[in-house]
């Protein structure tokens, strides 16, 4: 069987916090996974944000078929207005993330002279779709914002799996819940490469999900007097 030519090019998020962005090339088609910014170091005066370099994408703009955003935080979607000025490809995102993207781009149109018409496609967290002949699987992951997803792109040699930012928490409420079963199904089909988030992976123990803070905050408000 003839194999696909696959290239994986990280443009941000490597050995740094934020600015996440990957380019996956399958059969000469480019898929962009996330497009975030990061804030500069405290001594970098006069710089508001730092975004990835889009030079490679500008040179290959005709081959970019999709921009996939995994969740609604600036470190994975904040550079999108600047990316669209360089490469205007269809955007795919889960519902809440798509709403946040829409609001962000409308703000840029109003305040930053952003004039790009964009195509925003809403996907479900468990969707299986096809983009330009390439099967794409979405799977729910647990993160501090609801509606977060991971993405699996099919190749003849196996899936390229991009987890996004995640923790494993089987007690998460609906909207935050991950789908281990869907991940297992993708794994059984064969995985060529796993692109996995590693923030705080050197820390021992478990990460406490932010969505579990609600009960503790509620108690503080209820027990406080004179307010």
Annotate each predicted stretch with a short phrase.
Residues 1-68, 73-227:
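His/Asp/Glu-rich metal-coordinating catalytic cores
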């Amino acid at each position: 069987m003839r194999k696909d030519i696959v290239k994986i090019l990280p443009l941000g998020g490597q050995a740094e916090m934020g600015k996440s962005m990957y380019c996956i090339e399958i059969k000469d088609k480019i898929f962009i996974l996330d497009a975030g910014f990061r804030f500069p170091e405290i001594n970098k005066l006069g710089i508001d944000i730092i975004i990835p370099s889009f030079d490679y994408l500008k040179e290959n703009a005709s081959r970019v078929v999709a921009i996939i955003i995994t969740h609604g935080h600036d470190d994975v979607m904040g550079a999108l207005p600047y990316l669209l000025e360089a490469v205007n490809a269809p955007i795919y995102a889960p519902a809440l993330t798509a709403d946040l993207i829409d609001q962000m781009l409308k703000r840029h149109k109003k305040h930053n002279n952003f004039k790009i018409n964009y195509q925003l496609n809403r996907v479900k967290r468990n969707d299986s779709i096809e983009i330009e002949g390439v099967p794409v699987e979405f799977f729910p992951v647990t993160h501090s914002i609801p509606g977060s997803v991971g993405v699996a792109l099919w190749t003849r040699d196996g899936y390229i799996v991009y987890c996004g930012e995640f923790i494993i928490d089987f007690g998460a409420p609906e909207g935050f819940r991950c789908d281990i079963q869907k991940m297992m199904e993708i794994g059984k089909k064969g995985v060529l490469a796993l692109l996995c988030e590693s923030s705080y992976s050197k820390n021992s123990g478990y990460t406490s999900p932010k969505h579990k803070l609600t009960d503790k905050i509620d108690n503080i408000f209820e027990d406080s007097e004179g307010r």
